[in-house]
Amino acid sequence: MRKHPQTATKHLFVSGGVASSLGKGLTASSLGQLLTARGLHVTMQKLDPYLNVDPGTMNPFQHGEVFVTEDGAETDLDVGHYERFLDRNLPGSANVTTGQVYSTVIAKERRGEYLGDTVQVIPHITDEIKRRILAMAQPDADGNRPDVVITEIGGTVGDIESQPFLEAARQVRHYLGREDVFFLHVSLVPYLAPSGELKTKPTQHSVAALRSIGITPDALILRCDRDVPEALKNKIALMCDVDIDGVISTPDAPSIYDIPKVLHREELDAFVVRRLNLPFRDVDWTEWDDLLRRVHEPHETVRIALVGKYVELSDAYLSVAEALRAGGFKHRAKVEICWVASDGCETTSGAAAALGDVHGVLIPGGFGIRGIEGKIGAIAYARARGLPVLGLCLGLQCIVIEAARSVGLTNANSAEFDPDTPDPVIATMPDQEEIVAGEADLGGTMRLGSYPAVLEPDSVVAQAYQTTQVSERHRHRYEVNNAYRDKIAESGLRFSGTSPDGHLVEFVEYPPDRHPFVVGTQAHPELKSRPTRPHPLFVAFVGAAIDYKAGELLPVEIPEIPEHTPNGSSHRDGVGQPLPEPASRG
């Protein structure tokens, strides 16, 4: 007789076919938001079919950003979508990789836990995947068991890498019973311009591949650049053996935050609720409708330059971009993000060309020396012009380096970029020295996860947060060198937030009488921003950018800036010059 240890929780699997990047993560997130708005407790999980244990050491150009959870896991960027749409924190177990699964199974084999069995993909690998899927149905820290677990299966049906995950999902349905498991398949319906036709054959083949491994989808998401006509939906329902109510047309939406409305219009949430026999209420659109009004009916527009080294792939800064937009929503403003390659800002003329028409500058996190002098140059330009600046993680470190150079430490640098610098104003954290030296594992060893900080009561950041006790997520190996605090303070830079013991600098800023808004944080506040609850630092930053834009036409004396060079010196005489007093805007 089949056992049902978790009959209270339903499982919904989301797979993809035909092509990658169809929006499985956004589809899953939007459905999760809809079910949450119906009063259900939803949690989510991403299964990634790569052999890396986590994405922490992967190239951002290949993978996009690394999303850090509260408990310190380095996860896929889709977990960020889940948190933003569900408006709740997820644990590190929300991301499962092939690397994690194989590492666990091999470790068990070495300990002799398989009692001499021949260890194979089936059943040992699939059993470990099933264990991790079913574990998501356990009660959370508050003792609440989820009503629904939505699990996104990465990759595309037909990929070799995804097969163990799909097989495990099939076995979960067999184990829990068909009435407790739902399969949602996302497929492409391409439009052929020469013939003016939408083609259903790729979707039919994708579903056939899924059925060949024992999975018949309960519903299909048809991705297209236009609505799929009813006649084609009926054809797909017939050929793929799916209820017509489960064939969902999802044309491209103006904003990702419109997707829940698109799915609701097609009645996907109602179909899922009926199919899984879930308790529910009508969708409460109060909060989401307010968000959509702010998205589509802005009162003004501001331009923010994101000065980074991975700007060719916007996914490398996905959470930063979404946090900026959310900060704009709070002000009923549209934030236009100007993607600026940091290499181009190394000189004053380069910075002026790149930043001359923006209303704020954001310096995001990153690793490695490439582009660092450009980030520092962008800060120098913005500080002299009175442009609002927000620095995140590495951004804080660049603000500190720029401040140090402005008070005579012309060779100030980070130990990360120049281990032999005479003035390492940014130093390796003591517990990271062995790792940086190459004597320990690189992956998963940074200062990761949520840490508390104490803010100075009268600081800009305390005013933004409306409290002096905060907690933010981190991902770094380097910190401000406390031996240089007094010297750096001569620039006017204030260390406005530290760890509770006062040792680690968490926030820096210039007082409002020195600059309208320059704030840096060692943390990654973008990871806690939500579209309906924007992060206070981003709200304050966008507000400062709006004020700057409003003051652009006022008569302001612009000081002349000495030409900036990568080592912080002047082209004229090779001697470092302190920056002129920054322009102040009322």
UniProtKB/Swiss-Prot annotation:
Residue numbers binding UTP: S20, K199, T200, K201, P202, T203, Q204, K235
Q: Pfam families under this entry? A: CTP_synth_N (PF06418), GATase (PF00117)
- Per its UniProt record, what PROSITE patterns does this chain match? GATASE_TYPE_1
| Gene Ontology biological process terms, A to Z | 'de novo' CTP biosynthetic process; CTP biosynthetic process; pyrimidine nucleobase biosynthetic process
Binding-site list for ATP = S21, L22, G23, K24, G25, L26, K46, D78, A253
- Name the residues that bind L-glutamine: G366, L394, G395, L396, Q397, E416, R477
Q: Which reaction does it catalyse?
A: UTP + L-glutamine + ATP + H2O = CTP + L-glutamate + ADP + phosphate + 2 H(+); L-glutamine + H2O = L-glutamate + NH4(+); UTP + NH4(+) + ATP = CTP + ADP + phosphate + 2 H(+)
Misc. remarks from the entry: CTPSs have evolved a hybrid strategy for distinguishing between UTP and CTP. The overlapping regions of the product feedback inhibitory and substrate sites recognize a common feature in both compounds, the triphosphate moiety. To differentiate isosteric substrate and product pyrimidine rings, an additional pocket far from the expected kinase/ligase catalytic site, specifically recognizes the cytosine and ribose portions of the product inhibitor.
The protein here is known as CTP synthase
The scientific name of the source species is Mycobacterium tuberculosis (strain ATCC 25618 / H37Rv)
Upper taxonomic lineage = Bacteria, Bacillati, Actinomycetota, Actinomycetes, Mycobacteriales
